[in-house]
Amino acid sequence: LPIEVVRRCREAVGEDFIIIYRLSMIDLVPNGSTQEEVVQLAKEIEKAGATILNTGIGWHEARVPTIATSVPRRAFTWITKRVMGEVSIPVITSNRINTPEVAESVLADGCASMVSMARPFLADAEFMAKAEAGKSELIAPCIGCNQACLDHTFSGKLTSCLVNPRACRETLISWQPTTSPRAIAVVGAGVADCTR
């Protein structure tokens, strides 16, 4: 079915349209796909007309953490590196890549053609501008806590970020510089308060 879906999409949109297919590279659940099956599907998806393969790591039901703080940075890039040797289209990797330096090392090591990030952009909406300006030390990093992003999403609450209180509230709160600045002290501040 996935191969047919990609084939039909390619027929519908023509050759000059990018089709990104998200493929679970490792399921991390009992009776999940084997690496051989993943590679075989990746090859068939490429033949069917996908332009890029995007990496999925594990299922939400998996008992293996994939994005938590305890997971080492770039921990699953070995999986995309293995698939890259089997297909000729670009392969995107993800999971626990939360600084420009980590992303660059993934690319330099040939573990992926591209890097996907999501939570780092919740943590700091200016991530790319700071990275491009060579000021990565000013980026408020995603700490992998998943408390205000995933936990809120799964409980039907507004997604946010513990290190960025503005995340997902950009249109609800108007942040304007004060006309009468004052010196204040924050007592009992957590890590999120100290990053700004």
Residue ranges and their predicted role:
Residues 1-196:
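Flavin-dependent oxidoreductase catalytic cores
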